[in-house]
């Protein structure tokens, strides 16, 4: 039955991620699902981007949800697993930030980046965010997220 297929698809997608990643994805999904109906659609994306202070054209938004006009969490995971298969964590982080950079400027508003880091579950405590922030590549209230990701990742290697 379709139900069985859907369940199988869900579980195979879930096996590609660690529990931690799934938790993070859930939080990202919830951040984007502005009306909390369990589905991401064009209106959610619109809302999210307007909260970011940008407004991509409808055609851009439509293209984003073209594959799945009403995307549930599983669909969201599938999309990510396709994008992530074979990518390294650095790439994954970059891609995540890129989603919030609709004009592909390479920058995200500082406040938004802070929110993002603090809301990503237990990954970063306020102190860690503050610590990382001291070294973050910020100019004019915008964060260069590519440099930022390299910095975070470089840090992890130093600690290892």
From Swiss-Prot:
GO (cellular component) term, any one: myosin complex
Residue ranges of domain EF-hand in the record: 20-55, 88-123
Gene3D superfamilies, per the entry: EF-hand
Modified positions (Blocked amino end (Ser)) in chain numbering: 1
UniProt cross-references to Pfam families, sorted A to Z: EF-hand_7
Source taxon at top rank: Eukaryota
Binding site for Ca(2+): 33, 35, 37, 44
More info: This chain binds calcium.
Functional description taken from the UniProt entry: In molluscan muscle, calcium regulation is associated with myosin rather than with actin. Muscle myosin contains two types of light chains: the catalytic light chain, essential for ATPase activity, and the regulatory light chain, a calcium-binding protein responsible for Ca(2+) dependent binding and Ca(2+) dependent Mg-ATPase activity.
PANTHER family hit by this protein: MYOSIN REGULATORY LIGHT CHAIN 2
Record's protein name: Myosin regulatory light chain, smooth muscle
